[in-house]
Structures are given as structure tokens and as C-alpha cells.
């Protein structure tokens, strides 16, 4: 799996409500011991990413929302970055940002850092 495939599998996992499908996508995209940095803190393991998805991404008070990759994947070597938006059912952007991911030689994301919002 290349960088773009891993990132797109991660985004698809964030958007699916089927727990089994989400777990499969996360297993394809993320190393078992992935380190996940979000605005809410640091988590380790696929379970921490799954918890973030179900509680924060899918549990948003605005109702059903989805994560959309808004840029190409810039991948110099083992690092990748991409832009994203979090949009509601009407297509309005609620939040946007850039994520940076470290990708192993096997194509698994073993670290991901979420940068949400605009820089001052």
C-alpha cells in the first residue's frame, strides 16, 4: 500500500459507520501500535484511533458529518501530509486542517498528527 492508499483507507474508515468495515480499513491503513496525536491529546494503538472516530468524528453534535481529503498527498520519503475538511450533511465545512503521517516501508501509518484549524 502506498502513502495515498493508506491515507484514503484512514479517511474511509473515519466515514464508515459499520464497525467491522472500519476495523478492517484501519488494519489496512495503520500499524497496530500507531501513535495518534489529535487536538484532544495523544493515543496509542488502532483502538485509540477508532475511539476518536466514533466519539469525535461520528459523534459530532452537528449530526452526520464526513472527513474529506482536500489536497493531494505530498509524500517526500517516509512522511506524508494532506489537507482535509470536516463537512456536514449540507456540504458546509465545519473544520479544516492538515495531517502529517509517518509511513513505514510496508506502507502502514505508524504515526499521525492532526493539525486542525487555521494558524494565527
Where are these regions (language model features)?
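A beta-strand edge to alpha-helix "cap/lid" segment located at domain peripheries
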Residues: 56-120
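Short acidic-aromatic low-complexity motifs
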Residues: 1-29
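A solvent-exposed, acidic/Ser-Thr-rich amphipathic alpha-helical stretch
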Residues: 23-76
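C-terminal ligand-sensing/allosteric alpha-helical core of TetR-family HTH transcriptional regulators
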Residues: 6-10, 52, 82
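Short, flexible active-site loop motifs that bind/organize anionic cofactors or intermediates
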Residues: 16, 39, 99
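Generic, low-specificity signal for short hydrophobic/alpha-helical stretches with a mild N-terminal bias
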Residues: 8, 31-38, 83, 94
Amino acid at each position: 500500500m502506498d502513502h495515498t492508499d493508506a491515507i484514503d483507507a484512514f479517511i474511509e474508515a473515519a466515514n464508515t459507520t459499520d464497525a467491522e468495515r472500519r476495523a478492517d480499513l484501519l488494519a489496512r491503513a495503520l500499524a497496530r501500535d500507531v501513535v495518534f496525536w489529535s487536538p484532544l491529546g495523544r493515543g496509542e494503538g488502532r483502538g485509540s484511533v477508532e475511539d476518536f472516530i466514533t466519539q469525535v468524528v461520528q459523534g459530532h453534535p452537528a449530526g452526520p458529518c464526513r472527513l474529506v481529503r482536500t489536497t493531494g498527498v505530498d509524500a517526500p520519503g517516509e512522511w506524508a501530509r494532506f489537507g482535509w475538511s470536516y463537512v456536514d450533511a449540507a456540504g458546509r465545512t465545519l473544520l479544516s486542517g492538515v495531517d502529517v503521517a509517518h509511513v513505514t516501508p510496508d506502507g502502514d501509518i505508524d504515526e499521525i498528527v492532526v493539525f486542525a484549524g487555521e494558524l494565527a
